Amino acid sequence: MASTEEIVQMMQEASAEFAEADDVSFLDKMNSNIAQLEQQLREQMDESRQNIAKLEINLIDTEKSIGSLRELMKDATDEATIMKGSDKLNNLIDELQATENEIQMMNSEIEKKVSKLVEDEDNTSSEYEMISKELEQEYDPVFASNILKLKLYRSLGVRLDLDNNQILIQNKELGTIDTLPLEDELTEFFKVKYIWSRIGK
């Protein structure tokens, strides 16, 4: 197939010849050249449209790939955040349980000493002062700190039910309380996700 430049040149030559002689064959030749030029232009336009369509398909595929990568990054970030929260929550639960146990032991000791003061009418003044000092020592800064920690954990809506060996989770927005056993076959990941999904915000 002749190039565009060749077709134009042929038309120019044909025009020059036509100027010298008014012949039907020259008109036919010009019409043929024009038809070739139009056909070539149509083919070039079709090829351009095909290239544009391919580029659009590639663009769509690229956008889908980017979207998939973003979802993977989001899932990885969420999982990392939950796992990090799992460690913190496990430490919080252990510390909370230890604090509850410590408070129960302290309360038991205090009750024994108070009962001793009430029942023993023959206590001397020195014995009374000694026991009173022991009671005062029960409320030292460490004890006060543990009480504050316990209040903080409870303010988050997490409490331990040691009698039933379970965690109580309060949702302040809904006004509901959910329970979660401390010892079962559930994974730590599930426990953490379950607790955080139900804590009142």
Swiss-Prot record:
It comes from the Eukaryota. Component of the NDC80 complex, which consists of NDC80, NUF2, SPC24 and SPC25. CDD domains: RWD_Spc24. GO terms for cellular component: Ndc80 complex; nucleus. It comes from Candida glabrata (strain ATCC 2001 / BCRC 20586 / JCM 3761 / NBRC 0622 / NRRL Y-65 / CBS 138). The keyword Coiled coil applies. Pfam families: Spc24. GO terms for molecular function: microtubule binding. This is Probable kinetochore protein SPC24. SUPFAM superfamilies: Kinetochore globular domain. Keywords: Cell cycle, Cell division, Centromere, Chromosome, Coiled coil, Kinetochore, Mitosis, Nucleus.
